[in-house]
Amino acid sequence: MAAHKKSHIRIFFVSVMIILSLFSGFGEGQTYINYNGMKGDIIPGCSSKNPKECVKIPAYSYNRGCEISTRCQRQQHSSSS
C-alpha cells in the first residue's frame, strides 16, 4: 500500500513539474530593445515646424547669491596692466 501511495505522489510531482515548465516560457520578454523604448527623451511637439518647443530649460541655473562678508555688494575688480 505504501508503494502505491508513493507512486501517486511521484506522478503528481512529475505532472506539476511538466505543467510549470510549459508555463515558464509564456512570460519571456523581448531579447532586444526596440526603437519605441529609445524614444523616451523626445519632447512632444518638437519638430521643424515648431522649433521653439525643442529648447530645454536648464534644471538649475547657478546664482551665487549674497555674501555676508561683502554685505551683498559686488566688488569691482580693476584690471591693471
Swiss-Prot record:
GO terms for cellular component: apoplast. Disulfide bonds join C46-C54, C66-C72. Residues 1-29 form the signal peptide. GO terms for molecular function: hormone activity. Pfam families: RALF. InterPro entries: RALF. GO terms for biological process: calcium-mediated signaling; cell-cell signaling; regulation of growth. Keywords: Disulfide bond, Hormone, Secreted, Signal. It comes from the Eukaryota. It is found in: Secreted. Belongs to the plant rapid alkalinization factor (RALF) family. Cell signaling peptide that may regulate plant stress, growth, and development. Mediates a rapid alkalinization of extracellular space by mediating a transient increase in the cytoplasmic Ca(2+) concentration leading to a calcium-dependent signaling events through a cell surface receptor and a concomitant activation of some intracellular mitogen-activated protein kinases. This is Protein RALF-like 6. It comes from Arabidopsis thaliana (Mouse-ear cress).
